[in-house]
């Protein structure tokens, strides 16, 4: 489980969320970026946009495919990672760090209980 940090929650759509106070930091997992291949473009949502859990909010485009992004929890977008506009490869290089996608002000933290922990996500990715 080296590529599944224990301090995060995961969706079955391969997004992760790290909670810091009432802010959720969202990105895609190592597994997702590995399946996508070299990321060449990321469509980011507008700051201020209200998102619901599981709502589609953008896309990640790689040399192989285009994949929709889904929000793992409800909230208002308070920041997006503008570095991804010029350096989308950060998602491949550091998906849990510099490759984060957005920060949300969480509106319903109880929704996090619907997500997978690291062990469950790791098992999910191995089900194929």
From Swiss-Prot:
SUPFAM superfamilies: Single hybrid motif
GO BP annotations, alphabetical order: glycine decarboxylation via glycine cleavage system
Protein origin, superkingdom: Bacteria
InterPro entries xrefs: 2-oxoA_DH_lipoyl-BS (IPR003016), Biotin_lipoyl (IPR000089), GCV_H (IPR002930), GCV_H/Fam206 (IPR033753), GCV_H_sub (IPR017453), Single_hybrid_motif (IPR011053)
CDD domains membership: GCS_H
List of residues that carry N6-lipoyllysine: 64
Keywords: Lipoyl
Residues spanning the membrane: none
Any single Pfam family the record assigns to this protein: GCV_H
Cofactor: (R)-lipoate
Gene Ontology cellular component list: cytosol; glycine cleavage complex
PROSITE patterns xref list: BIOTINYL_LIPOYL (PS50968), LIPOYL (PS00189)
Domain Lipoyl-binding: 23-105
Gene3D superfamilies assigned to the protein according to its UniProt record, in alphabetical order: 2.40.50.100
Cofactor details (free text): Binds 1 lipoyl cofactor covalently.
Family from the record: Belongs to the GcvH family.
Function: The glycine cleavage system catalyzes the degradation of glycine. The H protein shuttles the methylamine group of glycine from the P protein to the T protein.
Subunit structure, interactors included: The glycine cleavage system is composed of four proteins: P, T, L and H.
Protein name: Glycine cleavage system H protein
Source organism (scientific name): Symbiobacterium thermophilum (strain DSM 24528 / JCM 14929 / IAM 14863 / T)
Underlying gene: gcvH
